[in-house]
Amino acid sequence: MKPSERRKARRLAVQAIYSWQLSGNNIADVEHEFLTEQDVAGVDIAYFRELLGGVATKKSQLDELITPFLTRPLDEVDPVEKAIVRIATYELTFRKDVPYKVAINEAIELAKAFGAEDGHKFVNGILDKLVARNR
């Protein structure tokens, strides 16, 4: 598997988690929708499924890890940035095979692509603090 396949999986997962957060739809339905209606060429489908399912099933645990580092309530965080931070926190917590620098860098790049103007700074700040506490 090429690193770019995981990058594409993360990118698709951010979009799917964003959709799930806003719609409240069943995560299996969101997964099906994205796998059938999006271009999944070159995407690590297994990793996409793991990120999507992992964030959905461990949302409360992930949010507990994230919340201490927020300067505002979690429900006030931009939904795109929330999706990105949840994915990165999942990787940092449950995918020890993913180097923390990779997880953070990928999250920053996703925030630059999808987030608000300074969203990448917010994402970086949260994840740096999370890693520092857990190392």
From Swiss-Prot:
Keywords carried by this UniProt record: RNA-binding, Transcription, Transcription antitermination, Transcription regulation
Highest taxon in the source lineage: Bacteria
Keyword Protease among UniProt keywords: no
Signal peptide residues on this chain, from the entry's feature table: none
SUPFAM superfamilies noted in UniProt: NusB-like
Any one GO MF annotation of this record: RNA binding
Gene Ontology CC terms: cytosol
One GO BP annotation of this record: DNA-templated transcription termination
Record family assignment: Belongs to the NusB family.
NCBIfam families for this protein: nusB
Functional note: Involved in transcription antitermination. Required for transcription of ribosomal RNA (rRNA) genes. Binds specifically to the boxA antiterminator sequence of the ribosomal RNA (rrn) operons.
Protein name: Transcription antitermination protein NusB
Species: Shewanella halifaxensis (strain HAW-EB4)
Gene that encodes it: nusB
